[in-house]
């Protein structure tokens, strides 16, 4: 079983991520992790922070000479802006007189609608939002993306599965239906300003972002994660918490700003007659296959062996330049929310984070099904399982 944990704040010295339960000999390097983190910064409409933020990756433990050793993997991602924040975010006490002179330490008492600010202050008994927003920030997803790269490497090396994501909707502009990216499309997608497969749609999405920026607004959208090469039988039908689609949905909903998830054609199936909603099964030269992919590659809480597709809907960024109404909790008076630099749209980056979460869930499911203390053992077990399937 895989377990993962992250720690750290948006403006703290670093983020730390730990992944436990990996077999030995998963090939992974600091360059792999750095590449994944660079992809997280992609996308038209990102804020100024993406221009100067750099992720300093240190593989702290669990990896030797480019291979995991079977113990927990620990990754640290340094914050290059830490010198600006070392007094405000210091772990040890700082002289109150010195803190009062720092503009960055001004109390954040005007909670932002759509953020964790207000309810976090209520729940954890804080008088201002800084202790809440620092951890609630999407900066934390960098740690998950780092772990997701390790999980992705395991999936490819153990069972040959590969993951790719793309943007299918942004600001109300939707790509044509039925476009499913292949693993070889990754570079082309990453070169597109909004990571959309359709060039004409991409141009319209960029125009929508430009208009939102001009209007002082933000935009959301929908990303789709596609997984090729999964074996059938990951997950289980026997308990709710072992169902693969439930685990995927929970992982995606755990990404900041995600408000909805669907597997396959999801909500569209609610309006489709049963005679057309399900993937019929046929027998061909390559064995049993489903003639469509409406289910998204899962049935009964298990992977079917077909292409897996999951979608996540991201709400618009809650830090809106056109400041929203709020209440100053220090005075009880009506006010406008705090505003700081932010993205106009982070939907393309959300796809990279979604890839990471899907990879972590699937890697856990693969190890649950096939076990193994080394990648070779996991791969051998998976191959033996496929060779002995009663129905193929």
From Swiss-Prot:
Keywords: Amino-acid biosynthesis, Aromatic amino acid biosynthesis, FAD, Flavoprotein, FMN, Lyase, NADP. It catalyses: 5-O-(1-carboxyvinyl)-3-phosphoshikimate = chorismate + phosphate. One of its GO terms (cellular component) is cytosol. One of its GO terms (molecular function) is FMN binding. FMN binds at residues 135-137, 256-257, 300, 315-319, 341. The keyword Zinc does not apply. Pathway: Metabolic intermediate biosynthesis; chorismate biosynthesis; chorismate from D-erythrose 4-phosphate and phosphoenolpyruvate: step 7/7. Transmembrane segments: none annotated. Reduced FMN (FMNH(2)). This reaction introduces a second double bond into the aromatic ring system. This is Chorismate synthase. It comes from Nocardioides sp. (strain ATCC BAA-499 / JS614).
């Amino acid at each position: 079983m895989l377990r993962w944990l992250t720690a750290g704040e948006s403006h703290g010295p670093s983020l730390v991520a730990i992944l436990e339960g990996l077999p030995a000999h998963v090939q992974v390097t600091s360059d792999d992790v750095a590449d994944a983190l660079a992809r997280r910064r992609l996308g038209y409409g990102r804020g100024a922070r993406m221009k100067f933020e750099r992720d300093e990756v240190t593989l702290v433990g669990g990896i030797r000479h480019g291979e995991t050793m079977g113990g927990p993997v620990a990754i640290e991602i340094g914050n290059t802006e830490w010198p600006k924040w070392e007094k405000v975010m210091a772990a040890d006490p700082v002289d109150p007189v010195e803190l009062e002179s720092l503009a960055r330490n001004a109390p954040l008492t005007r909670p932002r609608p759509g953020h964790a600010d207000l309810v976090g202050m209520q729940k954890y008994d804080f008088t201002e939002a800084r202790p809440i927003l620092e951890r609630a920030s999407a900066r934390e997803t960098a740690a998950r993306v780092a772990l997701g790269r390790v999980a992705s490497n395991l999936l490819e090396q153990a069972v040959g599965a590969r993951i790719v994501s793309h943007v299918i909707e942004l600001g109300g502009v939707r790509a044509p239906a039925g476009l499913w990216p292949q693993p070889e499309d990754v570079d082309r997608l990453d070169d597109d300003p909004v990571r959309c497969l359709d060039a004409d749609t991409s141009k319209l999405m960029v125009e929508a972002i430009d208009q939102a920026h001009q209007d002082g607004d933000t935009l959301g959208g929908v990303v789709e994660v596609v997984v090729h090469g999964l074996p059938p039988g990951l997950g289980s039908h026997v308990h709710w918490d072992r169902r693969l689609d439930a685990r995927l949905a929970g992982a995606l909903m755990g990404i900041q700003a995600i408000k909805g998830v669907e597997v396959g054609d999801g909500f569209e199936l609610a309006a489709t007659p049963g005679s057309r909603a399900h993937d019929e099964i046929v027998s061909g030269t390559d064995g049993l296959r489903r003639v469509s992919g409406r289910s998204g590659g899962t049935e009964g809480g298990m992977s079917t062996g077909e292409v897996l597709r999951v979608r996540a809907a991201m709400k618009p960024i809650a830090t809106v330049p056109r400041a929203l109404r709020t209440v100053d909790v220090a005075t009880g008076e009506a006010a406008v929310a705090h505003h700081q630099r932010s993205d106009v749209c982070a939907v393309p980056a959300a796809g990279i984070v979604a890839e990471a979460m899907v990879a972590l869930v699937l890697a856990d499911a693969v190890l649950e099904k096939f076990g193994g203390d080394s990648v070779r053992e996991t791969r051998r077990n998976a191959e033996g399982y496929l060779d002995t399937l009663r129905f193929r």
